[in-house]
Amino acid sequence: MNYLVMISFALLLVIGVESVRDGYFVEPDNCVVHCMPSSEMCDRGCKHNGATSGSCKAFSKGGNACWCKGLR
């Protein structure tokens, strides 16, 4: 049983664990990036920062803001 645990732990270290998250795209001063209803600017900005895609979230708490999916 101990060998199974040790082998599983070793595999996790060798394979590595990569996590992604969703969230708002922010400027250096930690303010959200506001957008128009067009999502093209958000998609480009999010992809530039390592996300898989981005869109404009209209009428959110912070106003119209860029939402990124799969940020690294």
Swiss-Prot record:
Name used for this protein in its record: Probable neurotoxin pcD-993
Tissue: Expressed by the venom gland.
Cystine pairings recorded for this chain: 35-56, 42-66, 46-68
Entry-linked PROSITE patterns: LCN_CSAB
Record carries keyword Signal: yes
Stretch forming the signal peptide: 1-19
Domain LCN-type CS-alpha/beta residue range list: 21-72
